[in-house]
């Protein structure tokens, strides 16, 4: 029977089932494949069971109950038919819950869940809360994005996270693990943030992993093992049977927000942040014959002029059914004073980046010819200045913001605390810090040339020597641009002592924050947090993405990744000097995210801040070329000797070492002296990147399938959150949430848009079809779960409205690719700095005028 059949035919199908003439499963596949069901969907019920954004929903095996997790850190089991809550569980999580699943064959009594702080909880509904709190796994270093259970296996589950690892846990072996730097359960080390996983339903030993380098990798789990089982391979290519990347994303780092196998396991659906949804056949291998872009072509594409916009954290005005593109708002005269202010600040930021970029390019040639360690005074004077005197320091990287997410900026291991320490862009910088999570947007990274970067570092050091150093510790504002977490790009404030800032910058040590900053969904709590809170470590997404740049083989470039598709062309620091207090307000915007370093305040705990909204802005598109880092020893005195000896000993290790480098936050090295800690972090990052680069080179020699895209689904907008799901519905339909607050449903075989449902006031993140019936559950930024059923009397699809929404989404998708989300405190500091600059200018004009008057009097 054709998919376009009518209801009378369906009634006959039901009659045949009652007579035993047809298999019930065939009937289900037939009615789920009918357009009349899809186009008659109507909101049946709303479950108000949470006090925060609902980031994960999951039906149980029988379709009777829904398990949900939220920013309120609670797990709730509810009955969607009676609208009642069965169980509310205080999970023990201290950050937004991103994924929660029932373990199969446990009668819905056992649950595994993960959150933005990387902690995984194993919960038994029948046990008390205190016992359940003991069953936690703190093995992941950064955000844990997803939990995946194995069909018909009640004992094991998998997880993936910002640290680039996929871990396999067996509850028969242990129900908790708080071991420091645990690597016992690592199944795969992707060297890049692993943001989504999926298991093939009919063949559960096939595992698909979505990474922040735009790739989807498929592994055969029979060829893999962990250290706990004694057969850990330690190579990211072991067991890999296929690797998929859309051709136009080959040289980019675009995060995968969702992976889903079809019921028959023949196709995989992949949703990319700040891009579209792709369908591919994992058994296909036709992409192998296509010519891959050369390194020069990749670099050329990275040289896009950065265009930056600013968005305040908690500003969801560009989401929801009533959101409009900027061009449409201007045409209708809807520009608000707030928008006007943000636009002026954005223009100023763009101007700074352009000036810094020009200076970086002019210095690039001189930097290559200048001998190591030689930086002339004239070079320092050529640094761009903001209206008055603030220096803008740029690590020659093109920063391209795709989808900004509010990500918490983490202090880089050493440069985090110093506005001058721009070493965060150094290629050998240490890993990332643990992320806090709420909702991040996709960001792209900066690509930095080693030579230019080196020159810039030297000018930074000279600048420090020339700058005044007060006798007492002065507060220095350090801003870090981070891309880890669930929202794209975020800027976080951190106050540090100027002495430590200078010391760290003089060492020339920096770390890439691989953490993708997280953005707080609706009610950002951290936007005005005290400075101490900002010093918390968060796992960055960027560092993992930076590593991917290595595969391009450009040894001279140092990539900086940003969750928001930001081609950050520079990491800049605006250091306006307050003439009255001598305080320097350092605005350190590091697109590669610094690894949190021990700051003057001892409060850098691993405990993450929880953001009000969990919708994570996809930290996706990153255009980076990761050059092989080259060590630069800029330290002096005993610390330099200690650092050098540590590095030399580490260099003796080979790539085949059992110590598999993982993306680790710099805070893990707090135990040792600052110099040694930073050196260890940098060395470990160096080996991690080198190992990833070698594995990428091996892919060309291995028999790994490379599928082509079978179908592309467009019209939705996926840029503000990192947890946006795409899913199959039956055998004939594909669906996805969107930043416009709608649910999109397409024909799986033709990509025709068939249905549009308004399902959230801001963003729809989660879509889970009922396992048997034509019922759909959805959730997003709103604090509820919505249940949809085919209750309309006639088809209600409005094609004209759908076309309007699609057109707006395309325009706004381009706009959000160039946007950075910043906290309100950043704007206040920026305005204060400009105020100081103006005051200094006026004071200078007055003194100059009085000086001329005195000269005239003397002449008379």
UniProtKB/Swiss-Prot annotation:
The IQ domain, residue ranges:
676-705
Q: In which pathway does it act?
A: Protein modification; protein ubiquitination
**What keywords appear on the UniProt entry?**
Nucleus, Phosphoprotein, Repeat, Ubl conjugation pathway, WD repeat
Question: PANTHER family recorded for this chain?
Answer: DDB1- AND CUL4-ASSOCIATED FACTOR 6, WD REPEAT DOMAIN-CONTAINING FAMILY
What function is annotated for this protein? Ligand-dependent coactivator of nuclear receptors. Enhance transcriptional activity of the nuclear receptors NR3C1 and AR. May function as a substrate receptor for CUL4-DDB1 E3 ubiquitin-protein ligase complex.
Q: Where is the composition biased (Low complexity)?
A: 422-441, 501-511, 616-626
Ranges where the record places region Disordered: 288-340, 355-676
Taxonomy, superkingdom: Eukaryota
Entry-annotated residues carrying Phosphothreonine: 654
Its recorded name reads: DDB1- and CUL4-associated factor 6
Where do transmembrane segments lie in this chain? none
Q: Which Pfam families match?
A: WD40
Listed under subunit, the entry gives: Interacts with the nuclear receptors NR3C1 and AR in the presence of ligand. Interacts with DDB1, CUL4A and CUL4B.
GO-annotated biological processes: positive regulation of transcription by RNA polymerase II; protein ubiquitination
Residues modified as Phosphoserine are 336, 649, 657, 847, 850
Where does the record say this protein resides?
Nucleus
> From start to end residue, where is composition biased (Polar residues)?
379-388, 409-421, 480-493, 561-571, 627-636
Q: Name one GO cellular component term.
A: nucleus
**Main subcellular localisation:** nucleus
SUPFAM superfamilies linked to this entry: WD40 repeat-like
Organism of origin:
Pongo abelii (Sumatran orangutan)
- Biased composition, Basic and acidic residues: where in the chain? 288-303, 312-334, 457-467, 535-549, 601-615
Under PROSITE patterns, the record lists:
IQ (PS50096), WD_REPEATS_REGION (PS50294)
WD repeat start-end pairs: 49-88, 92-133, 139-179, 189-229, 251-290, 718-756, 759-798
């Amino acid at each position: 029977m054709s998919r376009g059949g009518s209801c009378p035919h369906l009634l006959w199908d039901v009659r045949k089932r009652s007579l035993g003439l047809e298999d019930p499963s065939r009937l289900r596949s037939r009615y789920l494949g009918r357009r009349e069901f899809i186009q008659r969907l109507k909101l049946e019920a709303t479950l108000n069971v949470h006090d925060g954004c609902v980031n994960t929903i999951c039906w149980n095996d029988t379709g009777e109950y829904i398990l949900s997790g939220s920013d309120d850190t609670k797990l709730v089991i509810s009955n969607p038919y009676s609208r009642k809550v069965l169980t509310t569980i205080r999970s023990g999580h201290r950050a937004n819950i991103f994924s929660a699943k029932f373990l199969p064959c446990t009668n819905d009594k056992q649950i595994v869940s993960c959150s933005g702080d990387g902690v995984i909880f194993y919960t038994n509904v029948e046990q008390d809360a205190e016992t359940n709190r003991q069953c936690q796994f703190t093995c992941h270093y950064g955000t844990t994005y997803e939990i995946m259970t194995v069909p018909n296996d009640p004992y094991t589950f998998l997880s993936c996270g910002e640290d680039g690892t996929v871990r396999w846990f067996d509850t028969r072996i242990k129900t908790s693990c708080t071991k420091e730097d645990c690597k016992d359960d690592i199944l795969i080390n992707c060297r890049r943030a692993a943001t989504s996983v999926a298991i093939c339903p009919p063949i559960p030993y096939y595992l698909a992993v979505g990474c922040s380098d735009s790739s989807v990798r498929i592994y055969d789990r029979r060829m893999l093992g962990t250290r706990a089982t004694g057969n850990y391979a330690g190579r990211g290519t072991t067991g890999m049977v296929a690797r998929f990347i859309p051709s136009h994303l080959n040289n980019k780092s675009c995060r995968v927000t969702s992976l889903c196998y079809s019921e028959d396991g023949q196709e995989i659906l992949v949703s990319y942040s700040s891009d579209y949804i792709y369908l591919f056949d994992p058994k296909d291998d036709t992409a192998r014959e296509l010519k891959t872009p050369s390194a020069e072509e990749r670099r050329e594409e990275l040289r896009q002029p950065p265009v930056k916009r600013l968005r305040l954290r908690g500003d969801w005005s560009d989401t929801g059914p009533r959101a409009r593109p900027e061009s449409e708002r201007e045409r209708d005269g809807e520009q608000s004073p707030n928008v006007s202010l943000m636009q002026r600040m954005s223009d100023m930021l763009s101007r700074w980046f352009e000036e810094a970029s020009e200076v970086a390019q002019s210095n690039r040639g001189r930097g290559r010819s200048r001998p190591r360690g030689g930086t002339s005074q004239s070079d320092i004077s050529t640094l761009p200045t903001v209206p008055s005197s603030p220096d803008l320091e740029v690590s020659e990287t093109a920063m391209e913001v795709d989808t900004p997410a509010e990500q918490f900026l983490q202090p880089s291991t050493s440069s985090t605390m110093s506005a001058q320490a721009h070493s965060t862009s150094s290629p050998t910088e240490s890993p990332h810090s643990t992320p806090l999570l709420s909702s991040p947007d996709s960001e792209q990274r900066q690509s930095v040339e080693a030579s230019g970067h080196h020159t810039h570092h030297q000018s930074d050091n000279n600048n420090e020597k020339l700058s005044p150093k007060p006798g007492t510790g002065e507060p220095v504002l350090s801003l870090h641009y981070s891309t880890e977490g669930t929202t794209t790009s975020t800027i976080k404030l951190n106050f540090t002592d100027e002495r430590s800032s200078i010391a760290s910058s003089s060492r020339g040590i920096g770390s890439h924050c691989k953490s993708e900053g997280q953005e707080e969904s609706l009610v950002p709590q951290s936007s005005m947090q005290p400075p101490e809170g900002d010093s918390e470590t968060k796992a960055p997404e960027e560092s993992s993405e930076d590593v991917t740049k290595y595969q391009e083989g450009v040894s001279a470039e140092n990539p900086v990744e940003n969750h928001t598709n930001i081609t950050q062309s520079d990491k800049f620091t605006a250091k306006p000097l307050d003439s009255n207090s001598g305080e320097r307000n350092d605005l350190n915007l590091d697109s590669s995210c610094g690894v949190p370093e021990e700051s003057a305040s001892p409060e850098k705990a691993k405990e993450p801040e929880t953001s009000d909204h969990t919708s994570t802005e996809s930290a996706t598109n990153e255009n980076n070329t990761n050059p092989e880092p080259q060590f630069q020893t800029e330290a002096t005195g005993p610390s330099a000797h200690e650092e050098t000896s540590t590095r030399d000993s580490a260099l003796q290790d080979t790539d085949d070492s059992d110590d598999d480098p993982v993306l680790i936050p710099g805070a893990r090295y707090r135990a040792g002296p600052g110099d040694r800690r930073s050196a260890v972090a940098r060395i470990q990052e160096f080996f991690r990147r080198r190992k990833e680069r070698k594995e990428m080179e091996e892919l060309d020699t291995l028999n790994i399938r490379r599928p082509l895209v079978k179908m592309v689904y467009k019209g939705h907008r996926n840029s503000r959150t990192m947890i946006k799901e795409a899913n199959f519905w039956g055998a004939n339909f594909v669906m996805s949430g969107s930043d416009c607050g709608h649910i999109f449903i397409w024909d799986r075989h033709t990509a025709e848009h068939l249905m549009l449902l308004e399902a959230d006031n801001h963003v729809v993140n989660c879509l889970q079809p009922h396992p048997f019936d034509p019922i759909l559950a959805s959730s997003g930024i709103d604090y509820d779960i919505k249940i949809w059923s085919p209750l309309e009397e006639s088809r209600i699809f409005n094609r004209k409205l759908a076309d309007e929404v699609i057109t707006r989404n395309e325009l706004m998708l381009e706009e959000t690719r160039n946007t950075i989300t910043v906290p309100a405190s950043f704007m206040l500091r920026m305005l204060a700095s400009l105020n100081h600059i103006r005051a200094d200018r006026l004071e200078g004009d007055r003194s100059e005028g009085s000086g001329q008057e005195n000269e005239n009097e003397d002449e008379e």
